[in-house]
């Protein structure tokens, strides 16, 4: 085992200067000679730290508006030089060993995220010298430490104190892995951005923002290994997107309970994304990635009670999501009534945590304040490929709707229609949702024919003694035939909301008129497979 390597000389060159002054001071206080470039060097010098400009060290000035700063043999020889192997050649050419490199890269992602960013700006924010130093140091991690993240500064200083100014090979190897991950993600961003610019680059009139890159490079960070995947014979892990901008299962904090399973995470995501769509206090209960009970109300407790009563049988062992902080009364109702796998809410108050503490197997997550879903990409793996599409963040408002029947919906029917339309978006296709007074009373999910989803929704309502008469019905896609409308009329549905767009729309509308049903077209489909 190699003994810890002393850090005697460090090169610091960072775009993100978070924590760099304190870190540089810590290094200097421990006898480390500091080399630096440009703005980083000025910051250290103004703080009174002894620092040598790289241009003074190499005898070669920065040039070309800073494009060439560190690409010099005295820099890269000092980083790449193998101790005890290249010592003679380093002495011959007056190359001093550099034991630590502290670098983070030009803010390419932040630059191209601006709507007004030009290609020229993007080009100027492609770092060249930085990644070269990072990769050089990571390659020579046997002798050199590479630090690319300010979050690692305190741990590096602590280990140097533990080992008299030195770092272990294990730590240098771990830092090298982080460095390669950092440069891989950086190059991926650049490739994805310019790949999406191809149409504009070749004079195509199509807007480049509407294109997907020619090659797709993804950067996800492993959050946890799992006991197994969807089934016990499958290995699994959970990876998260470091750029996730909104509250999600990936960013949530687990407050108690066993480790989340693969299925827990998938179901919790479905529940949370559904509950986000409501502005009133809402509860969504999910089983096998399908909502089985959804309701809104004036209080969280009332919303939970109403959602649970939709389908108590399916709610057993389910996932419960709220869009308000969880309170003690609601927590008491849950644990007294049902077995639950996961509860997720923006926050969980202390009294509620006290109630749930008696059920330590219940996984409790706090996800933070909810925002409206942000645009992004959805992926579906197929054998030999990856389907990529824009995330379905579409939702309709009153002004988007068309009433196509003779009978107009009442205000209450319109509210119920919009409510169950939101729910239908999160139900596996073919999806049918019955709702009354902003509460689901029957959900038919995942059937191969739409009419059978409608029949199942009615059966579920009847099994729980819920009256469908006067309810609204949502369908995630258009009705191809009138049989779905006939099935809805048979159980007393009074209002139907659906996308429209079938070649048989006239027949469907005629069926609704025949039954005295109000029908609303959304002109937006929400298939979910």
Swiss-Prot record:
NCBIfam families: PRK00881.1 (NF002049), purH (TIGR00355). Its EC number is 2.1.2.3, 3.5.4.10. It catalyses: (6R)-10-formyltetrahydrofolate + 5-amino-1-(5-phospho-beta-D-ribosyl)imidazole-4-carboxamide = 5-formamido-1-(5-phospho-D-ribosyl)imidazole-4-carboxamide + (6S)-5,6,7,8-tetrahydrofolate; IMP + H2O = 5-formamido-1-(5-phospho-D-ribosyl)imidazole-4-carboxamide. Transmembrane segments: none annotated. Belongs to the PurH family. One of its GO terms (biological process) is 'de novo' IMP biosynthetic process. One of its GO terms (cellular component) is cytosol. InterPro entries: AICAR_Tfase_dup_dom_sf, Cytidine_deaminase-like, MGS-like_dom, MGS-like_dom_sf, PurH-like. The gene is purH. One of its GO terms (molecular function) is phosphoribosylaminoimidazolecarboxamide formyltransferase activity. Residues 1-148 form the MGS-like domain. It holds the Pfam family AICARFT_IMPCHas. The IMP cyclohydrolase activity resides in the N-terminal region. HAMAP family: PurH. It comes from Sodalis glossinidius (strain morsitans). This is Bifunctional purine biosynthesis protein PurH. Pathway: Purine metabolism; IMP biosynthesis via de novo pathway; 5-formamido-1-(5-phospho-D-ribosyl)imidazole-4-carboxamide from 5-amino-1-(5-phospho-D-ribosyl)imidazole-4-carboxamide (10-formyl THF route): step 1/1; Purine metabolism; IMP biosynthesis via de novo pathway; IMP from 5-formamido-1-(5-phospho-D-ribosyl)imidazole-4-carboxamide: step 1/1. Keywords: Hydrolase, Multifunctional enzyme, Purine biosynthesis, Transferase.
């Amino acid at each position: 085992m190699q003994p810890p390597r002393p850090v005697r000389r460090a090169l610091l060159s960072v775009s993100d200067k978070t924590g760099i002054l304190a870190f540089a001071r810590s290094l200097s206080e421990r006898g480390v000679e500091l080399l630096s470039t440009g703005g980083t060097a000025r910051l250290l010098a103004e703080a009174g730290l002894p620092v040598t400009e790289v241009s003074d060290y190499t005898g070669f000035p920065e040039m070309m508006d800073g494009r060439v700063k560190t690409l010099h043999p005295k820099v890269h020889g000092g980083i790449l030089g193998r101790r005890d192997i290249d010592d003679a050649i380093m002495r011959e050419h007056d190359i001093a060993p550099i034991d630590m490199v502290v670098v983070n890269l030009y803010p390419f992602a932040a630059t191209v995220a601006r709507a007004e960013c030009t290609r020229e700006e993007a080009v100027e924010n492609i770092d060249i010298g930085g990644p070269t130093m990072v990769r050089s140091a990571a390659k020579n991690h046997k002798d050199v430490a590479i630090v690319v993240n300010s979050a690692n500064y305190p741990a590096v200083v602590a280990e140097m104190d533990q080992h008299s100014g030195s770092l272990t090979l294990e730590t240098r190897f771990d830092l090298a892995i982080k460095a390669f991950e950092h440069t891989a993600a950086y190059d991926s961003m650049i490739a994805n951005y310019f790949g999406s610019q191809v149409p504009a680059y070749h004079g195509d009139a199509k807007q480049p923002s509407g294109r997907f890159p020619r090659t797709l490079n993804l950067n996800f960070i492993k959050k946890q290994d799992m006991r197994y995947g969807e089934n016990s014979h499958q290995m699994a892990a959970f990876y998260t997107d470091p750029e996730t901008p909104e509250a999600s299962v990936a960013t949530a904090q687990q407050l108690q309970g066993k480790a989340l399973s693969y299925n827990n995470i998938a179901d919790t995501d479905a529940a949370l994304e559904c509950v986000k769509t409501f502005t009133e206090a809402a509860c969504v209960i999910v089983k096998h990635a399908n909502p089985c009970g959804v309701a809104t109300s004036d209080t969280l407790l009332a919303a939970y009670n109403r959602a649970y009563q939709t389908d108590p049988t399916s709610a057993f062992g389910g996932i419960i999501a709220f869009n308000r902080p969880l309170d003690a009364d609601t927590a008491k109702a849950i644990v007294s009534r049902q077995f639950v796998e996961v509860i997720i809410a923006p926050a969980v108050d202390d009294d509620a945590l006290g109630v749930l503490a008696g059920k330590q197997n219940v996984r409790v997550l706090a996800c933070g304040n909810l925002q409206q879903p942000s645009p992004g990409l959805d992926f579906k793996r197929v054998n030999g490929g990856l389907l990529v599409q824009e995330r379905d963040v579409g939702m309709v408002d009153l002004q988007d709707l068309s009433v196509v029947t003779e009978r107009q919906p009442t205000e209450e029917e319109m509210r119920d229609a919009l409510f169950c339309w939101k729910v239908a978006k999160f139900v596996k296709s073919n999806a049918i949702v019955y709702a009354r007074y902003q509460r689901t009373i029957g959900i038919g999910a995942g059937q191969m024919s739409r009419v059978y989803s409608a029949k199942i929704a009615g059966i579920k309502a009847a099994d729980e003694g819920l009256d469908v008469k006067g309810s609204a019905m949502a369908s995630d896609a258009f009705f191809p035939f009138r049989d779905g409308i006939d099935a809805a009329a048979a159980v007393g549905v009074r209002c139907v909301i659906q996308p429209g767009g079938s070649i048989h729309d006239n027949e469907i509308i005629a069926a609704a008129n025949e039954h005295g049903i109000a029908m609303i077209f959304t002109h937006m489909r929400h298939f979910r497979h």
